[in-house]
């Protein structure tokens, strides 16, 4: 776990400090694999599992060699490859600073692939789009990296990319449905952990109350393995923070204010995750 935490810290610093690394995050081969093998659900599953198993096996083979340096380098390369593909903070800042017209539309378009619909210039839509982008670009990757190592990070990234690409390449409906279910199921535990972190660093009652209200609506349940609850919970948490921020009510329809608070909230959530990982490392050493 200590090496995993170190790899995550290095990856986050490099991804933020060296923007050119973003251009190395290429999965152009995935479309060819999906066209060749994704015609059936079994083939689509193979497209996800085969590369992930190979990467996981490579990581296992490198573990313990040269005091873990080889594994660390391999894990770092895998994280830099699977995070993103765009940097979250840069896109949030661009959206915050964008004027009206084409610049704003382009900034909103950066979040289109992270959401089922094109986000609109409204507080709720922007916060929902931003939290989905955070989940899919960063937190789900980190969750499965901590859980399963480099193979887990790649498995999630391939599942999400394949689910996004399936309509464009004309995959069968059954294959597309499988890919969407797998991607959603992999995102669900990461989304739930994000909500718990938000409850700790934001308005506890607003966050958990919104979580209960969303799941208590007809047709929804706690075991649906569906991360669709995340935008509603993020909006509730951000609204509560904005209203309490200066000791008086603030307009929660102010897109810029909500976007700024979302950026701060995501930083605090990341800090909670890293602190939790550090505590697990310390617990392992003490044991």
Segments from the language model and where they lie:
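Hydrophobic N-terminal alpha-helices or hydrophobic patches in metabolic proteins across all domains
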Residues: 1-287
């Amino acid at each position: 776990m200590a090496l995993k935490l170190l790899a995550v810290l290095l990856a986050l610093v490099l991804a933020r400090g060296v923007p050119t690394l973003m251009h190395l995050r290429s999965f152009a081969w995935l479309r060819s694999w999906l066209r060749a093998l994704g015609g059936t659900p079994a083939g689509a599953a193979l497209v996800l599992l085969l590369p992930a198993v190979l990467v996981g096996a490579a990581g296992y083979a490198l573990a313990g060699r040269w005091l873990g340096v080889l594994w660390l380098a391999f894990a770092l390369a895998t994280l830099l490859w699977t995070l993103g593909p765009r940097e979250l903070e840069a896109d949030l800042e661009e959206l915050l600073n964008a004027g009206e017209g084409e610049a704003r539309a382009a900034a909103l378009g950066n979040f289109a692939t992270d959401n089922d619909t094109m986000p609109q210039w409204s507080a709720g839509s922007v916060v929902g789009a931003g939290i989905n982008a955070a989940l899919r670009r960063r937190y789900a990757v980190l969750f499965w990296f901590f859980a399963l190592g480099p193979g887990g990070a790649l498995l999630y990234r391939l599942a999400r990319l394949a689910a996004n690409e399936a309509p464009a390449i004309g995959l069968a409906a059954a294959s597309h449905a499988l890919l969407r279910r797998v991607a959603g199921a992999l995102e669900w535990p990461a989304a739930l952990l994000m909500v718990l972190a938000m409850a700790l660093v934001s308005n506890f009652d607003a966050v958990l109350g919104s979580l209960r209200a969303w799941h208590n609506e007809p047709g929804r349940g706690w075991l649906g393995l569906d991360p669709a609850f995340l935008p509603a919970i993020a909006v509730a948490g951000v609204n509560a923070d904005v209203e309490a921020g200066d000791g008086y009510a603030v307009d929660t329809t102010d897109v810029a204010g909500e976007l700024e608070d979302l950026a701060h909230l995501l930083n605090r959530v990341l800090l909670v995750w890293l602190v939790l990982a550090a505590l697990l490392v310390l617990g392992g050493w003490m044991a």
